[in-house]
Amino acid sequence: MDLSGKIALVTGASRGIGAATAQALAKAGAHVIVTGRDAKALEGVEQAIHEAGGTATIAPMDLLESDAIARLAEAVAGRWGRLDVLVINAGILPTLMPVVDIDQKALGKAVSTHLLATQALLGSFDPLLRKSEAGRVIGLTTSVATRPRAYWGAYAATKAAQEVLLDCYAQEVANISKVKVAIVNPGATRTAMRAKAYPGEDPKSVKEPSVVADAVVALLDGDFPSPHRMSVN
């Protein structure tokens, strides 16, 4: 797999699937812009990438901060003039509870993270993705977005909305650009979010984030119909 010369941006890259994907992209030759709220964790990801022979730029930021995404897009445009890969991975898991008891503040944060930030990312980076020879958007999703489960209402509803937004965007750009969109369900993966949802689960019983990361890179190495949906087993 060769992504040499590609410019990639990964949100939620400080740990878990985001960090693993950033490292896999860099290993394949891409220069990776890693974003997240935890600057120290991002520095660790950057160091791991450099030690493996790759290159990266850290961009600590809060996706919910006003104009933060637009400012990042301006910086990327000024330095590279395009974006080849946008991996939308950042997410939060509200406390699992009945729909009638969902905390409005927590729901609002999930809406902002999964829906509003996704729209802002697409809106700000679309011009740069179109300047790529083969712009790609990868959105990480969850099985409960299409197969809802009791007590998962806040997370499932906002991730489902995110999927719809990505699907609509894919259709809108299909015939007027080379940009393509893939929605990837990582399945059961050893992450902090998974541990929060399933505190009694043996972490060794589920796959490591690197498995998902490798699947994403393999997807980017070829072509695919858009919108494309993929599950990682």
List the model feature ranges, each with a label.
Residues 7, 14-16, 38:
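Conserved glycine-rich cofactor-binding loop
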Residues 11, 83-91, 114, 139, ...:
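Rossmann-fold scaffold of SDR-type NAD(P)-dependent oxidoreductases
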Residues 28-45:
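Conserved glycine-rich Rossmann-like NAD(P)H-binding loop of the short-chain dehydrogenase/reductase
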Residues 70, 93-108, 151:
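Conserved mid-core segment of classical short-chain dehydrogenase/reductases
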Residues 74-77, 113-133, 170-171:
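Amphipathic alpha-helical dimer-interface segment in Rossmann-like NAD(P)H-dependent oxidoreductases
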Residues 92, 104, 130-131, 135-175, ...:
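Catalytic loop of short-chain dehydrogenase/reductase
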Residues 100-119, 138, 162:
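Catalytic Tyr-X3-Lys loop
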Residues 179, 183-184, 191, 199-233:
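C-terminal helical subdomain
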